[in-house]
Amino acid sequence: MDFLEKVLDNQVSESKELVKLYDYDLYTLGEAADRMRQNMHQKIVYFNVNRHLNPSNICADACKFCAFSAHRKNPNPYEMSLEEILEKVKNSYNKGIKEVHIVSAHNPNYSYEWYLKVFETIKQEMPNLHLKAMTAAEVHFLSTKFNKPFELVLEDMLKAGVDSMPGGGAEIFDEEIRRKICNGKVGSSRWLEIHAYWHKLGKMSNATMLFGHIENKIHRIDHMLRIKKIQSPKNQVENKEGGFNAFIPLLYQKENNYLKVEKSPSAIEILKTIAISRILLNNIPHIKAYWATLGLNLALVAQEFGANDLDGTIEIESIQSAAGAKSRHGLEKEDLVFKIKDAGFVAVERDSLYNFIQKF
């Protein structure tokens, strides 16, 4: 039996073996990943109508890969008030967004109660808006700053109206690499524990992997396997229990930060990474090719290599664009639909839990 066939048959589980998948040519990997993708999702490409909101860029951490936080290369600190946040969300809601995605720097000036008040107010005023908020890194920050168990932070978030968690803060799970790129940030084990407890509460989240910086291919494989391990076996496609909805390989953006990575991965390596994630993560229903970091054209190509989602209209995005991504002003829904259909796929607007809203 060929090695790839053994992998597809779940006969290989070690990172040092699975890294050999990168030795396959792109066509072979893509064919295997696309076959899995079509078995799960046919020719559908999902998107949602959403807004990203980043309340502050003032951060207690100093991650070397980050161009968003206020530092020497980004000397313009800001922090939004509750009223400013509410106004921005309302404006977008009135334009038709179905989800607001709130991720902030780890601002030491905000109180614990402030976060909960933001969530409660949004849900009180817009109860039908899906509130995706608080990365595991933010949860850990609040837990340590305010001396609260992370379990309590998650329970308070749930009571305040948070519907799901984004997958940010995972970066790459190898602790040696984490010490070099984001020393002091939430550790890999705690990141996984936070998501596992959120799932235990019956809620959904995503998982990300930042790649294309100083990590190597075996670090990526190890990262994927750790995500796979904590995914509930009950949650393979239908998502009726808490678990990971989607895995999102995030391409590192190299501008305006201190990591000093000169060369980005080739398009071939990017597509191989996406294909391998589909092949390995057979218990996670969706693989997202995040157009805000890949660019829309490459993200559409990735739909032939295992991905089945582009993310959404985004509207406003600050974190990736600060590092050079071309996502600052988002996309119109009509443009996304046209691009998806023009690439030969069926465009489906989804809600945040992948329920169909409209098929195009």
Model-derived features: where do they sit?
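Glycine-rich, proline-tolerant flexible connector loops at the mouths of alpha/beta enzymes
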Residues: 49-52, 73-76, 103-113, 175, ...
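N-terminal pre-triad scaffold of radical SAM enzymes
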Residues: 30-72, 77-103, 165
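Mobile, glycine- and charge-enriched loop segments
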Residues: 41-50, 55, 59-60, 64-73, ...
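Auxiliary Fe-S-binding modules of radical SAM enzymes
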Residues: 1-27, 87, 93, 224-228, ...
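Conserved, mostly hydrophobic/aromatic
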Residues: 10, 33, 63, 102, ...
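Conserved Radical SAM active-site core
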Residues: 72-229
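Hydrophobic faces of well-ordered beta-strands that scaffold small-molecule active sites
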Residues: 45-51, 100, 131-135, 165-167, ...
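Conserved short loop/turn motifs at secondary-structure junctions
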Residues: 18-21, 51-53, 104-108, 211-214, ...
